[in-house]
Amino acid sequence: MKINQLPAPVLTHGLVPLAHRLIQLHLFLTRTEVMNEIGITSRLDQGEKGIAVLWHQRLYGAISYAKNATKYQPSAIISRSHDGDLISALVHRFHFRPIRGSSSQGGKEALSAIVNDLKANPLAIHAADGPRGPRGVVKAGLIR
């Protein structure tokens, strides 16, 4: 059985909480070093805005920084797909604010929403390459 064939309650009330706990355990057992973290956080604390940009294949590594970013409650663009439903529920548990959209569904609205969100909040997160690739190539939209 594929994961997307499981009933929604099993996923949202079973798999997502389990994944959250496993990631918390992983974060507890590992050490993360962020280069120039004080420079970044001091600017955010002074009211400056920031967009953390990363590659799709590095998303899990970015979660390790989640515990340091929770006070900023960053917004993150997440696909409107079934997988995006799970990811959205998971990042919400880390105090990220999901904004749903992608290059194929609701991307324009998501980009507009994240720009508006940055007016009220200091930090947003976005994967610069689309989930369909090519990997490591910045897609149009984030930077105009």
Give the positions of each predicted feature:
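Membrane-anchoring hydrophobic helices of lipid-metabolizing enzymes
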Residues: 1-65
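Short amphipathic alpha-helical segments and helix-helix/interface helices
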Residues: 40-41, 88, 142-143
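Short acidic/histidine-rich motifs immediately flanking catalytic phosphotransfer sites
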Residues: 48, 120-122
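Catalytic core of membrane glycerolipid acyltransferases/transacylases, capturing the structured
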Residues: 49-105
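Acidic, metal-coordinating catalytic cores used for nucleic-acid/nucleotide bond scission
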Residues: 82, 104-107, 131-138
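Structural motif
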Residues: 107-113
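Short, well-structured alpha-helical segments in soluble
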Residues: 114-119
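Membrane-associated lipid acylation/remodeling enzymes share a hydrophobic transmembrane-juxtamembrane segment
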Residues: 122-144
